[in-house]
Amino acid sequence: MSARETAIDALLLQREIEAFYYHEAELLDDRRFDAWLDLLTDDIVYFMPLRRNVKYGSQEEAENSAEGVDAAWFDEGKHTLSQRVAQIKTGIHWAEEPLSRIRHLVTNVQITDAPPGGHGARELDVKSRFLVYRNRIDDETDIFVGQRTDRLRHVDGGWKVARRVILLDQSTLLAKNLTFFF
């Protein structure tokens, strides 16, 4: 494969992954949660650690709570994510009645690990930045900013999220709840 073909393959893969993320954001914004769940592998790990304020130089080992060891905002699999969706869909979920108005913005999508040749990859590691805007009732507004580190797996002709680590850029949660998905 020539350098030009390799570069074109990389661009096509980048565009394909960006389109996947834009589609995922649209599903969440439109409350099409069952379709969103279909974008997740059955063995997904969905993890959002607590963030700590730490001294410079110790952020690598101490800034985030440890997966499977410490408390976390989310440490879930497909079953618990499906239960959360089912609860929202009952119409009696107190934190989502009335429903929130939500927009997901995804940017700075970077494929951080892909096999050479890229476009035929079965799994990819991808980082992205997000901004989630939420408005509830008349005057409750929340803005969440952070980074997602995903493992995407190519399954049945399309991409699915096999692992998602969400780093929220807040050490203290400023919102009343986390009833939506990142």
Walk through the language-model features, giving the residues of each.
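Short beta-strand segments enriched in hydrophobic/aromatic residues
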Residues: 40, 130-132, 165
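Short, cysteine-centered beta-strand-loop-beta hairpins and adjacent loop/turn segments enriched
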Residues: 132-142, 172
